[in-house]
């Protein structure tokens, strides 16, 4: 059975070298399971519906792939040791985050330099206040690495499903912006409210998806799965994703 070796991101954070083997989620171990933890930093706040969206993210990964996920939501502070226990965090909000403290800046800098991955998910892209302020503060964290555009040709859009653009609760721009270090995108800036598309309330969805409704929500879920796979397998080779088996697997509906 072939295996895809996980990249440096979990290894650098002390999670060990793990293997992704189709049909064997236990190969990751508990420490290697994907969890979309919520970052607490500055004056930002993540509403409860989107916290549940983070839980749904892991559930959809488990349901659609052979990768393991941990759906239990968790909040981690940027200046606390708990940040370093897992390699993935989401920073979601709708308002200006204010100025991060120096301890928060140092914590995020260390997390990202060790190989952690951060997704900045603007819950109100129409105003853009959260996204702009997050970019401003992250320029203090990694001043030498300005954001760049990731077009649909980037491996992020091929890790499991073949996608032609990012989407979320709103359609948003056709590209993703990212801070790239070495070969890896360590920060993704999303102007699509991805957690809003994943969030559920009771037996239904917490928010409507515009303008594409059900089809757009499915595409948003697929995009979330791709991000999770990218986080787990950060050393994905661009040529590997063209293998016929993977093309067939990612292209079919789940």
Language model: regions and residue ranges:
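N-terminal secretory signal peptides and thylakoid transit peptides that target proteins
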Residues: 1-18
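N-terminal signal peptide c-region/cleavage motif recognized by signal peptidases
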Residues: 22-24
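An acidic, glycine-rich "communication" segment
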Residues: 35, 125-207, 211-225, 250-251
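Extracytoplasmic/secreted envelope proteins and their assembly/folding machinery
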Residues: 51-58, 105, 109, 131, ...
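Alpha-helical scaffolding within the catalytic cores
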Residues: 73-78, 101-107, 172-175
């Amino acid at each position: 059975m072939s295996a895809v070796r996980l990249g440096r991101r979990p290894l650098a954070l002390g999670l060990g070298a793990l293997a992704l083997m189709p049909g064997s989620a236990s190969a990751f171990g508990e420490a290697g399971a994907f969890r979309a933890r919520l970052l607490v930093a500055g004056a930002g706040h993540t509403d409860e519906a989107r916290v549940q969206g983070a839980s749904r993210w892991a559930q959809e990964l488990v349901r659609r792939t052979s990768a393991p996920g941990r759906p239990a939501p968790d909040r981690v502070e940027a200046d606390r040791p708990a940040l370093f226990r897992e390699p993935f965090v989401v920073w979601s909000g709708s308002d200006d985050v204010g100025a991060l403290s120096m301890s928060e800046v140092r914590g995020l800098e260390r997390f990202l330099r060790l190989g952690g991955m951060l997704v900045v998910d603007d819950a109100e892209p129409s105003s853009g206040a959260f996204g702009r302020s997050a970019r401003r503060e992250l320029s203090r964290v990694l001043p030498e690495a300005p954001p760049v555009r990731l077009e649909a040709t980037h491996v992020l859009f091929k890790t499991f499903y073949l996608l032609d653009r990012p989407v979320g609760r709103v359609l948003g721009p056709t590209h993703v912006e990212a801070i790239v270090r070495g070969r890896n995108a360590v920060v993704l800036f999303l102007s699509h409210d991805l957690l809003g598309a994943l969030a559920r309330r009771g037996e239904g969805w917490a928010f409507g998806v515009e303008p594409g409704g059900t089809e757009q929500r499915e595409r948003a879920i697929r995009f979330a799965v791709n991000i999770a796979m990218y986080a787990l397998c950060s050393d994905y080779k661009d040529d590997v994703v063209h293998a016929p088996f993977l093309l067939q697997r990612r292209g079919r509906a789940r």
